[in-house]
C-alpha cells in the first residue's frame, strides 16, 4: 500500500504543478514511480505462477483489488488526462521523439478506454467491472494451475518411455523419488509434458497426456468438473461485453 500511496501522491504532485507540461515534468516522473511499483509486484506475480503456495496465493489475491482500483483511479483522473492533453496540444510535443510521442498518444488512448469521458455512475460501474474481471482472471489461472498439479501418472516400466531423452527420464525419476515412489512420475508441467509429446514413442501415452493437458479446468477429461472454468469464462465474457458497451464499442474485440 505504501508503493500505491507513493504513486497516488506523485500523480497529484505532477498534476498540481500546472502547465506547461513536458516529458520531463509529466511522463518521466510517472514512469519512474510506476517502475518502482512494477519491481515490487512483478516478482510476487511471477512467484505466484511458478512457486505457488496457499500463503503466497492469499497474499497475491489481496493485492489484486488494490492494483485494479489504482489503475482505474489513474485512468479516470481528470486532472492527469488534461495534463496529457495539454502536452499533446502544446509546443513541447513537437520536440518529442517518435517513441515519446507514441507513449503520450497511447496514454490518451488508455484514458479513453478507462472511461474518462463517461458520466460518474458509469465510471463507477467501469471500476466495479474492472475489479471483478481481475478477480475472475486470477480465479481462472488458479483453476488451471490446480488442474495442472492435480494430474500425475506413475510409469513403472521404462520401456513405455522409449524415445525419451536421458535428461527427461532422470527428471521423471527424480519426481517419483521426491514422492517416495518407484518408477517415473509424469506431470502436466511443461518440463515433464513437452518431452513426452516430442520424443516418446508410446502413442497411447502421448494421447493420454494430451487429453489430460487439453481438458484441464473444464467439464471434460480425467478430472471433468473439478476446477471447472466454464462458469468463470461465462462471467468474463458477459462482463467484457458490458464493458465494451459502456465504452461505446459493439463488442470487446473492438476495445
Question: Which ranges hold each PLM region?
Answer:
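Zn2+-dependent metallopeptidase catalytic domains
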Residues: 1-255
Amino acid at each position: 500500500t505504501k508503493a500505491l500511496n507513493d504513486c497516488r501522491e506523485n500523480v497529484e504532485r505532477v498534476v498540481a504543478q500546472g502547465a506547461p507540461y513536458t516529458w520531463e515534468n509529466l511522463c518521466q516522473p510517472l514512469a519512474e514511480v510506476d517502475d518502482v511499483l512494477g519491481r515490487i509486484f512483478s516478482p510476487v506475480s511471477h512467484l505466484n505462477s511458478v512457486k505457488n503456495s496457499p500463503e503466497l496465493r492469499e497474499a497475491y489475491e489481496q493485492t489484486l483489488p488494490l492494483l485494479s482500483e489504482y489503475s482505474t483511479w489513474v485512468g479516470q483522473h481528470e486532472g492527469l488526462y488534461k495534463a496529457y492533453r495539454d502536452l499533446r496540444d502544446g509546443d513541447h510535443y513537437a520536440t518529442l521523439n517518435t517513441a515519446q510521442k507514441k507513449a503520450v498518444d497511447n496514454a490518451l488512448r488508455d484514458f479513453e478506454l478507462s472511461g474518462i469521458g463517461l458520466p460518474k455512475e458509469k465510471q463507477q460501474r467501469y471500476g466495479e467491472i474492472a475489479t471483478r474481471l481481475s478477480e475472475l482472471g486470477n480465479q481462472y489461472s488458479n483453476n488451471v494451475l490446480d488442474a495442472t498439479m492435480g494430474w500425475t501418472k506413475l510409469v513403472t516400466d521404462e520401456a513405455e518411455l522409449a524415445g525419451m531423452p536421458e535428461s527427461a527420464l532422470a527428471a521423471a525419476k527424480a519426481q517419483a523419488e521426491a514422492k517416495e515412489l518407484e518408477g517415473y512420475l509424469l506431470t502436466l508441467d511443461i518440463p515433464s509434458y513437452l518431452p513426452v509429446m516430442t520424443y516418446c514413442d508410446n502413442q497411447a501415452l502421448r494421447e493420454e497426456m494430451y487429453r489430460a493437458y487439453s481438458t484441464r479446468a473444464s467439464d471434460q477429461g480425467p478430472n471433468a468438473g473439478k476446477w471447472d472454468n466454464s462458469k468463470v469464462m461465462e462471467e468474463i465474457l458477459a462482463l467484457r461485453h458490458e464493458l465494451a458497451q459502456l465504452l461505446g464499442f459493439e463488442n470487446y474485440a473492438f476495445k
